[in-house]
Amino acid sequence: MSLDQRLQTTSLTIRADERVVLLGASGAGKTTLIKLCNGSLQPSRGALQWRGQPLKRLPRHERRSIGTFWQDLRLVEELSVIQNINSGALGRHGLIWALRNLLGVLEKDACLAVMQEVHLNPSLLKRAVTELSGGQRQRVALARLLRQSPELVLADEPLSALDPVIASDVLDTLLSLPGCLISLHRPDLIHRFERVLGLRNGALVLDAAPDMISKTQLEWLYGRS
């Protein structure tokens, strides 16, 4: 995978079944890398591939195997909880299904199942997302991701500004999925992952297992030495 001008050109391979954490100081290029991996940003050179195929040419049903947990959540404010959760399944259905989702309740049992997984009260099923607390909104976004059933999850700073209980639930849910690439400002959590990538000034400078990384390396990665 060749990256764009905000990152130094490199090659990086991530398996769909890996749990990878991405570390680096603010401005190191973490968000850019996440956006490149989900196709919302195109590289200025080279190409991104998923399962050996160019990412930008994949049909919708193939692209849904990559899910993104957005830092700003990207909930549809005009829709209810169940409608937002069901939007995670759009990649498996056509236009008629999408229109029916806008008009009423579809696949209620499937939605209740993922709500239970993220500890979201079922009484909120038909509630407008504008009426929810910040923590409840986080859980709706997580439930939507579970409805998508992705093979690889991308997440950019998903734990920022969360209280410890919600942050723990969010990370547990993301790590329960088949594979993930998650950017964090939490070096203390690297033991939860199989592989650590480190960016500094747009360059990939670290790629190792957590138990192979020293405190000195982490301090250098964040510009503290």
Feature roles, as predicted:
Residues 142:
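Hydrophobic anchor residue at the start of the ABC signature
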Residues 53-70, 104, 213:
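ABC ATPase NBD coupling module
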Residues 38:
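Helix-to-loop junction immediately C-terminal to a conserved catalytic motif
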Residues 128-132, 136:
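Conserved ABC ATPase signature
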Residues 203-225:
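Conserved beta-strand-loop-alpha-helix hinge in the C-terminal portion
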Residues 98-123:
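Conserved ABC ATPase "signature" region
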Residues 153-157:
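Catalytic Walker B motif of ABC-type/P-loop ATPase nucleotide-binding domains
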